[in-house]
Amino acid sequence: MHRRKAFIRQTFGGFTLIELLVVIAIIAILMAILMPALNRAREQGKRAVCLNNLKQLGLAWILYADDNDDNIVNGDTEESGTFGPPSSGAAYMPGGRHHQERPWVLKDWDAGMTLDDKINAIKGGALFLYCGKNLRLYKCPIAGREEGQEQRQRTYSVVDAMNVQPYDGGPMIKKRTSIKGPPERSVFIEDAGATPMGGWSIYYTQNAWRDEPPVKHGNGANWSFADGHSEYWKWQNPDTRKWSVDNEGQWKAVVRPGDVDIYRARKAAWGKLPD
């Protein structure tokens, strides 16, 4: 009788090894099912924060123009230095396209720059006050996943057409009233490159990428537009993400006639195209 009670206690008083293995297996299966959904939810949350960052930057961009006789802010950070000779480049010299134009962010990427240097470059830019002095608006929450991104304090760039440079002969705009169809014209974009120098470039005269298309958020990118709204674009060509990853920092022009992603990005960046 005592032996039977002991057996019952061993059987029902705790889990057997087999029962524990079954429970662990069930938990593993549930985790395998739930983790992709949790990751997607986490990414959607970060995407929403990024979209809001771009929207706030876009509104700051509009407010700046309102306060400056409709002149849009200088979007070129590559040669800005400390905004003045001798460290600034030719674009900032008399006769240059950005003479006496403070950029939205001072040059914030160069060899030897410290974290404080990069933060001060943002604070010294023309939009910092219009952004409510909020440093978080300048960086996508997903930054840090890619190599080198954790060293960046800014992950957004201005497209070349919006007072950066007339790349590939494209029309560069300086007045907000000169923008035709503001809801379709991009201003800020996530920068997929290894560094955020200058603006974001794409070819004007041919259907080709110049800077890599951003692919931080799944297989798509967040953009802001000249009317102040922001939106997410999902790339249609399955090769877009692969091209971006394979060509990071190489600025390699590969003409792709008929590529809908390139054409759409070119239209947003430049407006009316020559082709």
What are these model-derived regions, one by one?
Residues T11-R42:
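N-terminal single-pass transmembrane signal-anchor helix
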Residues R4, R42-V49:
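Intracellular coupling helices
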Residues M1-F15:
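N-terminal leader/signal peptides at the extreme start of proteins
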Residues A48-D275:
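Short, well-structured segments within or immediately adjacent to enzyme catalytic domains
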